[in-house]
Every structure is written in C-alpha cells, then in structure tokens.
Amino acid sequence: MNYMLIKIGEFDISECWDGVFYKKLSDYPNITDWEIQNVLDFIRYEEENGRTCRIETQREILKKIEDYKQRKSKHRIAPPEIIKECTACPKYKGCMTDLVCHTSPLENAIKIMDSGCLLSPVIARGLTALELKNESRNAANDPQDYFEYIMFAWGNCQAGDRLVMERKLGRFPNDEDLGKDFTPGVRFFFCYDKLVKHPDATFEGVLPLKVKNRVVLSDWVSSIIVPDVYKQEFQSHIPQNLKSKVHYLKNDCADIWEWSGKVYEYAKHFV
C-alpha cells in the first residue's frame, strides 16, 4: 500500500480503514484548527512512511486547510477539553482529553506486568511487521509500520475494550456481547500532557498519539485499572515499583459504555 485517501465529511466516527482515513468534523462543514492539525499529522506520518495522500472534501474545506498551512506556527495546538467528533458515548457525548489509555486482555496484561513495559505488537509477539500485516485479524488492512507502535485511545473511549472482545470472540461483537456478556480488559491510563513528551511519541492524526517500540510503565503510567475478578491471577505479577499504580474495580455495569465511564472516572483520581 503506497497511497492513502483522506475523506473529510459527515461520518459516524473518525477512523482509518483499508487505506481510507474517514475524518469526521465536529461541526461539518466547519473545520477547526485542531481538526486541520489532525489531517496534516496524518499526511506527514503517511509520507514519512512512503505513502502519498489525497484529500477528498468540499472546496471550502480544502481552502481552509491551505490557509492554515500558510499561517501555521511552530507550536502544536492542544486538544480541546472534549472532542465531539464521536458522540456515540452516551454519558460524555465526546472524547475527554485529559487521559489516554491502552487496553489489554488479562493474559496480555500479565505479560506487560512481567516485562514492566507496554510493547509494540512486533516486539510483544516476536513477529515481523509484514507478518502481522498479513494476518487475517488485520481487518482494517493497516500498513505494516502501524505494528511498530503502541496505540492509545482517549481515556473514556470504549474502543480498546471492544477490540479485546473482538479478539476474544474471533468476530465483531454484537450488542449482546457488549451488554450482558461483556468482559472488560485491563486498562493502562496515562496523562495525555505527560505522554506526549515521550521521545518516541508520534502524532498520526487518527489516534490521540502512539509510541514506537515500548513504554516503560514506571516512568509514564498514572494508573492500572484491573477488573476485580482478575485480582487473584494478576496480583502475583505486579512488580514492586508498580504496586501503588494498580487498582481493582468491580464491573457491576450494564454494558461497555457504563464500564468505560466508570473506569475513566476512577482513573481521574490518580492524575
């Protein structure tokens, strides 16, 4: 894959899927400087990895992007307190930007604790990026360099737990899977304003950020939230320098949305 298409418009969410970056605007057809920065981050990252990009959108939006490029400062624009591109979350109606998180199933979370690091898929699984790209579970057809990074979602987002369920089931989860049959993963929370200073952090326009190769937990993590049903299996794997970061939380929630809100609100206490 050496070409990426950027479609800016009205979509359910912003996502990159099979070579297309669907960029949803919070107030279409108006585009904010933050949203323009996302688009330019995506173009920069893709071009650095040998892929050209083309934007498909209204002429007025293209003009605003060009105008921004002419007046762009050297300083990055900080995210708004809440990003309203995705309003699927029933409680927040958007993405809260104080925290980011990485979510893992129990077995992977134990390996993370044993190593003391979040690791990219290439390192964690001991496969090449090309091998990971060619796996059937790469449903989005992500390019191989994507697998050299650890990916993060906004702190109140349910996407990580949804992916955990998808991996568990071997298919896309349905409403029942995300409701009464939902089993949450372990969440590793980080302060966004701190993690952006990681020397290997990258902005690629789709995610809040991603980090290449590894993140040493003792240096960066703010809290690790574990469903309390995993406590007995999990606690023997916690290194001494992370014991104060680990918290157990009961999943007494009706669905993935309620759990995402509960765990995010709990994690905010440890910022």
Language model features with spans:
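NAD-dependent ADP-ribosyltransferases
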Residues: 1-271
